[in-house]
């Protein structure tokens, strides 16, 4: 091996004594400090040849490192990097246990099966040079990705939930950048198999969460070359359960009889044992059930906010405690007597959060899917008077529950905007909060950023021109 004394570049020449199947490795260090942390490697290996000798390489600090072929092959991930870059990240759950949200900037590397989080862009290169270095990793097999504007006051936030119960929020203020990341991760998830391996890992997670770990611990023990008696015990349990087919068939037949004797859903509903939920039901069904055109829960929330929340800083923008919001959701779904002035709902952000959740969970949004493109075309009209008239015409065509609920809601939001000097919530701010919640396309396309802009503008226009849009025909 030769080393130049005038350059930072070190090269290795293959040993002539090696066979043609030997590994040739060249490690080149660049002049800059940043590039020295990220080294490029090239390797040539002919087929059917075992390499037993380690490959020596010299670094500028003259320290010796031995790198065998096994070390190279056992590197955790040699898949192609599909995308990498900086995003804001917050881990909000670990194994199903909720964590405090803490945003930090991370260098994210996306491959075909997983994502890795690093503190900076240099670390992926350092990870390959430091044995045992493990970045925070997200297995995408069986994972779920969705936009979650309710989880943060920041814009452009989406959440990744893994089968192991980990939850991550990712965010960027740059619209096209976050959209690219969302679609890249979603495509990676969609390409992965959703059977067997993912299902088994999901089952293992559920077993661990329910403390049913006897069999799992036994399997772990076996994989770690446990004592022979432990292996025999595990084999005995597995064989015993496999040979007990008669008992299982009897249990199965009893379950079939039990299920066949269960009353139908209609019978349970007629007896009042099962009731339609308020959250997640179609708007017209909720109104039919209550014999009204505006859901009672919507009216209650609006009255509570107007009593004690009109002057609260960031009303509707600031998120309330999610656990308390879910508790309020449960009370409403059980049709229990609701008093929003009760001390447990004293945080007005819990009330506003529940109201936003109600509209967000409607199977069809307040602006029905079939009207979405028509509203978008109307907001594109340049002339303001013509634009207002087009929007008013569309609003008048809405189903009665949608129109009446929309009128009540926007009248309320107009009162919020009137207190802008105190609560700092302008019509534009309210448009950003409620735009994606109240209207959205039935199927998301690549124009998500453009749609989001139109959604905000439509809500903003309807607030600023409320009297003209919801007024009489002569207005």
Swiss-Prot record:
Places the protein is found? Cytoplasm; Membrane
Q: Where is this region: Disordered?
A: 1-22
Q: What is the membrane topology listed in the Swiss-Prot or TrEMBL record?
A: Peripheral membrane protein
- Domain Rho-GAP stretches: 281-470
Name the PROSITE patterns on file.
PH_DOMAIN, RHOGAP
Q: Which GO terms describe its biological process?
A: small GTPase-mediated signal transduction
Q: Which Pfam families match?
A: PH, RhoGAP
A single GO CC term, please?
plasma membrane
- Provide the alphabetized UniProt keywords: Cytoplasm, GTPase activation, Membrane
Q: Which residues form the PH domain?
A: 80-190
Q: Which InterPro entries match?
A: PH-like_dom_sf, PH_domain, Rho-GAP, Rho_GTPase_activation_prot, RhoGAP_dom
Question: Residues at site: Arginine finger?
Answer: 317
Please list the GO terms describing molecular function. GTPase activator activity
Q: What does this protein do?
A: GTPase activator for the Rho-type GTPases by converting them to an inactive GDP-bound state.
Protein name (record): Rho GTPase-activating protein 15
* GN (gene name): ARHGAP15
């Amino acid at each position: 091996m030769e080393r130049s004394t005038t350059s930072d570049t070190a090269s290795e020449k293959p040993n002539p004594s090696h066979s043609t199947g030997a590994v040739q490795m060249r490690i080149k260090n660049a002049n800059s400090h940043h590039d020295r942390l990220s080294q490029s490697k090239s390797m040539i290996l002919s087929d059917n040849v075992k390499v037993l000798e380690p490959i020596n390489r010299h670094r500028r600090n003259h320290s010796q490192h031995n790198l065998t072929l096994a070390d190279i092959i056992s590197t955790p991930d040699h898949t192609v990097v599909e995308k990498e870059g900086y995003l804001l990240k917050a881990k909000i759950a670990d194994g199903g246990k909720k964590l405090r949200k803490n945003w930090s900037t991370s260098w994210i590397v996306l491959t075909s099966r997983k994502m890795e989080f690093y503190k900076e862009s240099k670390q992926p290169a350092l990870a390959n040079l430091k044995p045992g270095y493990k970045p925070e990793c997200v297995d995408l097999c069986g994972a779920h990705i969705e936009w979650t504007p309710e989880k943060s006051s920041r814009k452009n936030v989406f959440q990744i939930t893994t089968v192991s119960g980990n939850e991550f929020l990712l965010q960027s203020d740059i619209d096209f950048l976050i959209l690219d990341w969302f679609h890249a991760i979603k495509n990676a998830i969609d390409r992965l198999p959703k059977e067997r391996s993912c299902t088994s890992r999901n089952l293992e997670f559920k077993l661990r969460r329910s403390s049913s770990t006897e069999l799992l611990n036994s399997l772990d023990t076996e994989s770690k070359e446990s004592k022979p008696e432990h292996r025999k015990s595990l084999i005995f349990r597995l064989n015993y359960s496999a040979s007990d087919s008669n008992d299982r068939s009897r249990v199965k037949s009893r379950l079939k009889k039990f299920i066949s004797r269960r009353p139908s859903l209609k019978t349970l509903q007629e007896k009042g044992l099962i009731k339609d939920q308020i959250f997640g039901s179609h708007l017209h069904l909720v109104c039919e059930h209550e014999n009204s055109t505006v859901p009672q829960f919507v009216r209650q929330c609006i009255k509570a906010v107007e009593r004690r929340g009109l002057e609260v800083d960031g009303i509707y923008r600031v998120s309330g405690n999610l656990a308390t919001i879910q508790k309020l959701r449960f009370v409403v779904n059980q049709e229990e007597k609701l008093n929003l002035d009760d001390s447990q709902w004293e945080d007005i952000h819990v009330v506003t959060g529940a109201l936003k959740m109600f509209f967000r969970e409607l199977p069809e949004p307040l602006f029905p899917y079939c009207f979405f493109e028509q509203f978008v075309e109307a907001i594109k009209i340049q002339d303001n008077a013509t634009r207002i008239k087009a929007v008013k015409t569309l609003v008048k065509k809405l189903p009665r529950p949608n129109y009446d609920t929309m009128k009540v809601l926007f009248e309320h939001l107009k009162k919020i905007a009137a207190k802008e000097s105190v609560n700092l919530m302008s019509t534009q701010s309210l448009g950003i909060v409620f735009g994606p919640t109240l209207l959205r396309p039935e199927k998301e396309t690549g124009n998500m950023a453009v749609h989001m802009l139109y959604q905000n503008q439509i809500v903003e226009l309807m607030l600023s021109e409320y009297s003209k849009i919801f007024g009489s025909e002569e207005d």
